[in-house]
């Protein structure tokens, strides 16, 4: 799997080259185009309750899209509707990534996406709200890199803002 971020300054697009059998999951409105070798299916990451929590609490989609290259190597283009960049972050399993609601765009198959609730004081006084999106596992995550969204690394040692 190879990718590159096209037009990084204005309305960026991620061009993902999938080898046969590889897949990527993304927000339901993130895919712009795909080649004929790629199939799309709707999935509920985290089951029904995970989908409900993601939709009701974080403004993310109830369903995610899984795009799989089934008939040979394929290409998928995805992006978001907001102006600003797209950030790619590789996770190795030793830490996770937390983004504000609306900040998740796509991830490779080794990444789990879940809703995380902040504590009462953090939820009241932070600009992020009570619920965030957490990504963990091994793989690559793609998220919005605009001034509206903050990205945090999380591990057993705590949180650190990512710039």
Question: Language-model segments: which ranges?
Answer:
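Composition-driven recognition of glycine/serine/threonine/acidic- and proline-rich low-complexity segments
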Residues: 1-163
